[in-house]
């Protein structure tokens, strides 16, 4: 009898417990749904439909499971309900505990919602953050979620069973799979961690706000159940990172489709920062041709390189000619830039006179359309106006200076320009007074204090026998001008700088008409060209018209590449002389005046050192103004060694050429301490 009573009491206890579980099922289920509605109020209607369809699917699966195990849940619930009133005290106590638990959950939900908003704001501020930093943040959030989950599990231990049953009807979008009832709690906990980490890593390549939402929802849904992989292999965060393109798949087809659709609807692609990529590419790119800022240059006054006779810049030169400033050895101007010196290559006429070239040099620096002057154009019979230059130093004026460095005839051209700036052109001034009209500021004079220094390299200040004996012959001039005429056609890019003489085909002019017109040009009988100015007569005329400026530093560099013959006083060309100059070098070496024989292949040493009628001194460390400072003659240096055009010369190396120009540029910077009027 006693055993029967014990059995009845045990049966009663089981029945009361079942009633309690059923009651908690309905109460907590309704309250959990209310809590989820509050948290997910902002979610789209699509999320709600998706979650409901998933819940329905899982409910059907649970029903099937119960039928397979022979459990009649409905009948069992009805039998237990009849005895509900037998233990009101226990039921009320459990109701109270359930209410307290739901309140705690609602508080946690509110905290999670606030944390979610904060994470979204932080993520918005750091959209351009390093992906590595984002990964670290996600891992930290996962760890925090795990810790929060353990604490939450301890608080809700009493209602664990009811939560597990209710989860099937209220499974949120963050966890799309479920666990089999046969799994124990430790397996459930492990699989919850894996799936939540998987979901976070799956969203990581997408919008960071979505990823942070999942971290927050991870804490809210810490009791949700997932179905394990068949092989039950433990996954780590690092494994998931390496397989972001193939995350853990849901076990059901409907779950897979619903999950993917929700991700597609809420995902926003995070595009690379294009500006950052461009800045990085620039930073890593080649810096060879980078131009330093004005404040970073060693020289205050720009250096302007002025080429000589038959000189061109690369954009207009015949293809058979090497780069003028450096040849194949180096680009002198670019090398100066790379080493902190602001420098330019002037582009002026290759065969024009010193006067025409000086005018062109002025406009090359200042900018504007070339005006050769009305009087000059009328005197020599060519066009008054020439090409238009953009200008490299548009603010060039008294007080704003430049360094002028001229090679060969370029040294004469520089001297002519300085004379025009300081004293103007008396002929142009008189012509303008008589005929009125405009006059270029260059010809008015009173433009002193615009040149800091004048440096010449192998310049025939007193002319050269090479031009006297060969260059000024009618046959030679005819050949050269014919070449200029040929390259003057409208389809040619080569420019000999003789357009003012008509040696440039007009756009609508046939080539036959162009040739006929050129034959009538005054160029063929004029002295207004480079051939004449390079003769000793032409150079002497320039020396009479020019003078030294007491405010300018003058310096000359001279080379020689000949040696005395064995049986005479004549000079013979050295073996390493630039081959085209061997003939002219030997001709000059036979000159009647012995002092003119030593030469660099084109220019005699005595002519390159200084103009005969102007003061000079040997160059020293002391910088002097208003006088030619003559540097020691550089032996075994021919006419083009100063500019590195002889690529076959193994004696003169690139390093030697580079050292020469660095030393020259450094000297120019030192002269600014003497010529800078701003310091006075």
Swiss-Prot record:
Q: Which residues form the propeptide?
A: 35-290
GO terms for biological process? Answer: lipid catabolic process
Show the ranges annotated as biased composition (Polar residues): 40-58, 162-193, 204-223, 235-246
Active site annotated at which positions?
A: 408 (nucleophile), 600 (charge relay system), 639 (charge relay system)
Q: What GO cellular component term, any one, is given?
A: extracellular region
Q: Which reaction does it catalyse?
A: a triacylglycerol + H2O = a diacylglycerol + a fatty acid + H(+)
Sorted UniProt keywords: Calcium, Hydrolase, Lipid degradation, Lipid metabolism, Metal-binding, Secreted, Signal, Zymogen
Main enzyme class: hydrolase
Signal sequence coordinates = 1-34
State where the protein is found.
Secreted
A GO term for molecular function:
triacylglycerol lipase activity
Task: Tell me the InterPro entries matching this sequence.
Answer: AB_hydrolase_fold, Lip-like_C, YSIRK_signal_dom
Q: Which residues bind Ca(2+)?
A: 638, 641, 646, 649
Enumerate the residue ranges of region (Disordered): 39-58, 82-260
Enumerate composition-biased segments (Basic and acidic residues). 84-112, 224-234
Give the Enzyme Commission number: 3.1.1.3
What the record says about family reads: Belongs to the AB hydrolase superfamily. Lipase family.
Q: What is this protein called?
A: Lipase 1
Question: Which organism does this sequence originate in?
Answer: Staphylococcus aureus (strain MRSA252)
């Amino acid at each position: 009898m006693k055993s029967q009573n014990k059995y009845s009491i045990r049966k009663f206890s089981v029945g009361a417990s079942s009633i309690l579980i059923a009651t908690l099922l309905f109460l907590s289920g309704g309250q959990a749904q209310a809590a989820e509605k509050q948290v997910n109020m902002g979610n789209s209607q699509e999320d709600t439909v998706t979650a409901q369809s998933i819940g329905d699917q899982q409910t059907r699966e649970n029903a099937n499971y119960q039928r397979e195990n022979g459990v009649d849940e409905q009948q069992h619930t009805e039998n237990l309900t009849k005895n509900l009133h037998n233990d009101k005290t226990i039921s009320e106590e459990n109701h109270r505990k359930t209410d307290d638990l739901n309140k705690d959950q609602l508080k946690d939900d509110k905290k999670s919602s606030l944390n979610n908003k904060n994470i979204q704001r932080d993520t918005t501020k750091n959209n351009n953050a390093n992906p590595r930093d984002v990964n670290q943040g996600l891992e930290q959030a996962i760890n925090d979620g795990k810790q929060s989950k353990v604490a939450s599990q301890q608080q809700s231990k009493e209602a664990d069973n009811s939560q597990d049953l209710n989860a099937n009807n209220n499974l949120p979008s963050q966890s799309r799979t479920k666990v089999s009832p046969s799994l124990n709690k430790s397996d459930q906990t492990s699989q919850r961690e894996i799936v939540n980490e998987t979901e976070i890593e799956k969203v990581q390549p997408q919008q960071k706000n979505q990823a942070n939402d999942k971290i927050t929802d991870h804490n809210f849904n810490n009791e949700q159940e997932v179905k394990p992989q068949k092989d039950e292999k433990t996954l780590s965060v690092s494994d998931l990172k390496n397989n972001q393109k193939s995350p853990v798949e849901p076990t059901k087809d409907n779950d897979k489709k619903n999950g993917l659709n929700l991700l597609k609807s809420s995902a926003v692609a995070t595009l690379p920062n294009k500006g950052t990529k461009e800045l990085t590419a620039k930073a890593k790119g080649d810096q060879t041709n980078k131009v330093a800022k004005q404040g970073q240059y060693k020289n205050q006054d720009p250096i302007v390189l002025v080429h000589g006779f038959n000189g061109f810049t690369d954009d207009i030169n015949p293809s058979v000619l090497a780069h003028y400033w450096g040849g194949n050895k180096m680009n002198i101007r670019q090398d100066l830039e790379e080493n902190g010196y602001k420098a330019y290559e002037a582009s002026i006429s290759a065969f024009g006179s010193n006067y025409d070239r000086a005018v062109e040099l002025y406009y090359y620096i200042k900018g504007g359309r070339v005006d050769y002057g009305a009087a000059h154009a009328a005197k020599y019979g060519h066009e008054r106006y020439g090409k238009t230059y953009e200008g490299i130093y548009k603010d060039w004026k008294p007080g704003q200076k430049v360094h002028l460095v001229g090679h060969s005839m370029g040294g004469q051209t520089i001297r002519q320009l300085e004379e025009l700036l300081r004293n103007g052109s008396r002929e142009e001034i008189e012509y303008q007074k008589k005929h009125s009209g405009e006059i270029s500021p260059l010809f008015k004079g009173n433009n002193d204090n615009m040149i800091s220094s004048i440096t010449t390299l192998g310049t025939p200040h007193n002319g050269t026998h090479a031009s006297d004996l060969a260059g000024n012959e009618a046959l030679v001039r005819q050949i050269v001008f014919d070449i200029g005429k040929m390259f003057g056609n409208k389809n040619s890019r080569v420019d000999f700088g003789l357009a003012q003489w008509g040696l440039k085909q007009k756009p609508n002019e046939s080539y036959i008409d162009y040739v006929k017109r050129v034959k009538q040009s005054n160029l063929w009988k004029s002295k207004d060209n480079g051939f004449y100015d390079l003769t000793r007569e032409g150079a002497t005329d320039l020396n009479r018209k020019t003078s030294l400026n007491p405010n300018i530093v003058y310096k000359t560099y001279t080379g020689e590449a000949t040696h005395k013959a064995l049986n005479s006083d004549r000079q013979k060309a050295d073996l390493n002389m630039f081959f085209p100059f061997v003939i002219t070098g030997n001709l000059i070496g036979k000159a009647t005046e012995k002092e003119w024989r030593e030469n660099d292949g084109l220019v005699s040493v005595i002519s390159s050192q200084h103009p005969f009628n102007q003061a000079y001194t040997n160059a020293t460390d002391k910088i002097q103004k208003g006088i030619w400072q003559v540097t020691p003659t550089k032996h075994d240096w021919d006419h083009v060694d100063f500019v590195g055009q002889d690529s076959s010369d193994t004696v003169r190396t690139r390093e030697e050429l580079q050292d020469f120009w660095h030393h020259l540029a450094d000297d120019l910077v030192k002269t600014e301490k003497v010529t800078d009027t701003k310091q006075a």
